[in-house]
Curated annotation (Swiss-Prot):
Source taxon at top rank: Bacteria
Gene Ontology CC: one annotated term: cytosolic small ribosomal subunit
Location of the region described as Disordered in the Swiss-Prot/TrEMBL record: 245-266
InterPro entries referenced in this protein's UniProt entry, alphabetically: Ribosomal_uS2, Ribosomal_uS2_bac/mit/plastid, Ribosomal_uS2_CS, Ribosomal_uS2_flav_dom_sf
Family: Belongs to the universal ribosomal protein uS2 family.
Gene source species: Chlamydia trachomatis serovar D (strain ATCC VR-885 / DSM 19411 / UW-3/Cx)
GO molecular function: structural constituent of ribosome
This protein's record includes keyword Ribonucleoprotein: yes
Name of this chain's protein: Small ribosomal subunit protein uS2
Keywords: Ribonucleoprotein, Ribosomal protein
GO biological process, one term: translation
Magnesium listed as a keyword: no
Alphabetical list of NCBIfam families matching this protein: rpsB_bact
Length: 282
């Protein structure tokens, strides 16, 4: 039995997934996914979000069935910890700190950086390296920087079969690299983004941690389910000894004057009756 997306419109609404950006900051190409304009904000059609999410789940299961890997990409503050945790749990690769140019189009350079990281670790572990305390401290600092940037792709030895991106506008370099190589892109897309380069659009609020977490968890569960059904072992892309010290990430307030404000957020519950009519707008 295949994985079934059980997410509901009510859950999406409660997470704030319906809040788009101010009407002055929209991308007209997102019009098919917009339900209405309210108080200067565009409201995303959550019925279409749910429909697109179900298609995304099917795409993920196909990718896993073809024995291809997935690369989760989300480097902005609201997404990075969610992306990292989800990728580790489902055993896929991730880029959560920064996108290194050429991560896909120039993998040889990235692999060389990984080799450098491995050499530094050997030097730090060696008791007879002959390095001074100052040199060891500088080496440790360089190690932390490399590990932060390469942690999620350290063991990615071939191109992924799918990119899952949070905010393709913010991650435009990653999307462009995937496009050049013909790698399909699945993305959480807000009303200010261009959906054209995206193969699988999931329209939603990509600025709210609650919204991001809710949707990413569905995608993560789809990966786990597909692997279990196929008998594929779930291996974390990060080995325990490789993990850097984790930083706490606080829930961010909704950005005022940019995406949505608290006043509009509180009105969200009033939109529940309207959501019942979303199907009529398809």
């Amino acid at each position: 039995m295949e994985f079934s997306c059980t997410l509901t419109l009510k859950e999406l609404l409660e997470s704030g997934a319906h809040f788009g950006h101010q009407t002055s900051r929209w991308n007209p190409r997102m019009k098919p996914f917009i339900f209405e304009e309210k108080n200067g904000l565009y409201i995303i059609d959550l019925a279409k979000t749910l429909a697109q999410l179900k298609k995304a789940v099917a795409c993920i299961q196909t990718t896993i069935g073809q024995e291809k890997s997935i690369l989760f990409v989300g480097t902005k503050k609201q997404a990075k910890q969610i992306i990292r945790e989800a990728a580790i749990e489902c055993g896929e690769f991730f880029a959560s700190e920064r996108w290194l140019g050429g991560m896909l189009t120039n993998m040889a350079t990235i692999r060389n950086s990984v080799k450098t990281l491995n050499r530094i670790e050997l030097d730090l572990e060696a008791s007879n390296s002959g390095l001074t305390k100052k040199e060891l401290a500088l080496l440790a600092k360089r190690h932390r920087k490399l590990l932060n940037n390469l942690e999620g792709v350290r063991h990615m030895n071939s191109l992924p079969g799918l990119l899952i991106v949070i905010d393709p506008g913010y991650e435009r370099i990653a999307v462009a690299e995937a496009g050049k190589l013909g790698i399909p892109v699945m993305a959480l897309v807000d009303t200010n983004c261009d959906p054209t380069p995206i193969n699988h659009v999931i329209p939603c609020n990509d600025d709210s941690m609650k919204s991001i977490r809710l949707i990413v968890n569905v995608l993560k569960d789809a990966v786990i389910d597909a692997k279990k059904r196929l008998g594929v072992e779930i291996l974390s892309p990060v080995r325990p000894a490789e993990r850097p010290a984790e930083e706490a990430v606080e829930e961010l307030p909704l950005p005022t004057g940019e995406a949505q404000d608290e006043a509009s957020s509180k009105e969200g519950v009033l939109l529940w009756a309207d959501i019942d009519n979303c199907e009529a707008l398809k």
